[in-house]
Amino acid sequence: MSYKCSRCKRDVELEEYGGVRCPFCGHRVLLKERAPEIKEVPVE
């Protein structure tokens, strides 16, 4: 799962039991990245 640190804006990959902390700056607030693809929904 890909996250972005809210302080240093770097991409962070978290492991399943690694804890929630940025390995670069130590900040504990991580933002979940959205999927880059756009979904199309048919409208009737």
UniProtKB/Swiss-Prot annotation:
The catalytic activity of this protein is classed by the Enzyme Commission as: 2.7.7.6
The record's cofactor note says: Binds 1 zinc ion.
Query: Which SUPFAM superfamilies does the UniProt entry name for this protein?
Result: RNA polymerase subunits (SSF63393)
Which cysteines does the record link by disulfide bonds?
Answer: none
What cofactor does this protein call for? Answer: Zn(2+)
Q: Which GO terms describe its biological process?
A: DNA-templated transcription
The family database entries (Pfam families) matched by this protein are listed as: Zn_ribbon_RPAB4
UniProt GO molecular function:
DNA binding; DNA-directed RNA polymerase activity; zinc ion binding
Q: Which GO terms describe its cellular component?
A: cytoplasm; DNA-directed RNA polymerase complex
Q: Where in the cell is it found?
A: Cytoplasm
**What is this enzyme's class at the first EC digit?**
transferase
Q: Which UniProt keywords apply?
A: Cytoplasm, DNA-directed RNA polymerase, Metal-binding, Nucleotidyltransferase, Transcription, Transferase, Zinc
What function does this protein fulfil? Answer: DNA-dependent RNA polymerase (RNAP) catalyzes the transcription of DNA into RNA using the four ribonucleoside triphosphates as substrates.
How does it associate, per the subunit comment? Part of the RNA polymerase complex.
The molecule here is called: DNA-directed RNA polymerase subunit Rpo12
Q: Which organism is it from?
A: Haloquadratum walsbyi (strain DSM 16790 / HBSQ001)
